[in-house]
Amino acid sequence: MVTIRLQRGGAKKRPFYQVVVADSRNARDGRFIERVGFFNPVASGNAEKLNLDLARIEHWVGTGAAVSDRVAKLIKDAAKAA
């Protein structure tokens, strides 16, 4: 099953997440199909906190991809801000 989920990066105590489309059988930080955005929870100043390609997310959801709970909340926040 294909899912849209977060992939953790960054350093210890400074997380940075890529929003990716991946096969659910792959590891959290493993192989993915497409990168559709990022989420930086520790962004400060004028640094960008959230960037999502809503058109590509819409495409993947239309083809049957499941969305993780956290990514669903991020999509809702991004749509509200746009």
Swiss-Prot record:
Entries under Gene3D superfamilies matching the protein: 3.30.1320.10
A Gene Ontology term for the protein's cellular component: small ribosomal subunit
InterPro entries listed in its UniProt record: Ribosomal_bS16, Ribosomal_bS16_dom_sf
GO BP terms in the entry: translation
Example of a GO MF term: structural constituent of ribosome
Alphabetized Pfam families for the sequence: Ribosomal_S16
Assigned keywords, A-Z: Ribonucleoprotein, Ribosomal protein
Presence of keyword Ion transport: no
HAMAP family the UniProt entry points to: Ribosomal_bS16 (MF_00385)
Family in the record: Belongs to the bacterial ribosomal protein bS16 family.
Protein name: Small ribosomal subunit protein bS16
Organism per entry: Aeromonas hydrophila subsp. hydrophila (strain ATCC 7966 / DSM 30187 / BCRC 13018 / CCUG 14551 / JCM 1027 / KCTC 2358 / NCIMB 9240 / NCTC 8049)
